[in-house]
Amino acid sequence: MSSSLWLQCLQRLQEELPATEFSMWVRPLQAELKDNTLTLFAPNRFVLDWVRDKYLNNINRLLNEFCGTDIPILRFEVGSRQVVVPSSQIIAPAAPAVTLAPRPLPATRILQDDAPSRSWEPAPSPVQPESKSGYRSNVNPKHNFNNFVEGKSNQLGLAACRQVSDNPGAAYNPLFLYGGTGLGKTHLLHAVGNAIADRKPNARVVYMHSERFVQDMVKALQNNAIEEFKRYYRSVDALLIDDIQFFANKERSQEEFFHTFNALLEGNQQIILTSDRYPREINGVEDRLKSRFGWGLTVAIEPPELETRVAILMKKAENHNIRLPDEVAFFIAKRLRSNVRELEGALNRVIANANFTGRAITIDFVREALRDLLALQEKLVTIDNIQKTVAEYYKIKMSDMLSKRRSRSVARPRQMAMALAKELTNHSLPEIGDAFGGRDHTTVLHACRKIVQLREESHDIKEDYSNLIRTLST
């Protein structure tokens, strides 16, 4: 009874909620109906609190609809039950931005020696605090969840990483984060590693760039120590690999990682990967690997929106014991939009100039300190440049941007260009409308809202937006 009732609720919730929300928060819940009490089990406290806060009314409404007067009491608990709703009975969302696959069945874990053989050991890394189990984790202690600035652009990724750190190997495995350079993916990897190590001091957590995995494998082959290499990587509790796209065209490395990936998953050992693009779009990587990358949860890390950029600047300034005026933070954030590293670099330059000259940090001072950087941004990002870039991206004529044509093949790129003009320039809505064939400002506003909606609903539109932002901001 519990499976059929909760299955009905799941099917309706999947229809009502955005695919990202359903996969992230609702799908992991398990249900048990006993003594007229429906207990929903969440994988951790974070998910439980979120579901109860955001979706309790939806669930109660559906129970009332399906059960009539015989409504069960609803309870929430952290944990799991043995029998779960088969994932095959849930309607698969069409091209979701976040995908969730069934977790692998647990297997008997083979314990290895705590440290690899002396004939081979991992390549050195700049940051190498030794874990208590003897593994060089390479996790940077400076990066944690407390100093990661949350915004709409990274909210899902941050939530997923928190869940994984609460319950490694069980929450979402593998977790795949993708997005452009300098958006915080590496920070999140280190934050997960630190959180796991804080909770379980003896946990064997390894962070690395994908190229280091390749270097370690080559070294192991040269020293005839491939078995030690395998033991090391297959006996960790969490493997965090950055920039997995660098495995492209490295067939032997892909072969070894394929088997390592399978071994870790079978042992319920956590895997987190990052890339600069969606798994299926990584060229030069075997299809069987790309398929496995999407088995767990795939989350996009977007370029930060204005409010998040301002918050990042204020947080970084606070770390330097600098009071950054609000108007200065907004001035910088409105003009530098591509990624977090660019913002940090600009702020560091402003702070250094202020320290050297002893001057107060004002808008005029910032304009002078960043004059070359701001001039370059203003030169790169104009409405005309946006129109040309979007037209080329969607393979339409520049004249179509200004025309009255309403076919989707033209209207959608035009809406995208308007939304980008609002995000990337300082022009007002009427000015943007004038640049698009004399359109009214309400048309521009509608276009911006439409693109926001489509980015939530369509993976393709979200990818187009991110790709165009990167192109125009580089």
UniProtKB/Swiss-Prot annotation:
The keyword Cell inner membrane does not apply. Residues 128-137 have a biased composition (Polar residues). Keywords: ATP-binding, Cytoplasm, DNA replication, DNA-binding, Lipid-binding, Nucleotide-binding. One of its GO terms (cellular component) is cytoplasm. Oligomerizes as a right-handed, spiral filament on DNA at oriC. Belongs to the DnaA family. This is Chromosomal replication initiator protein DnaA. It comes from Photobacterium profundum (strain SS9). The gene is dnaA.
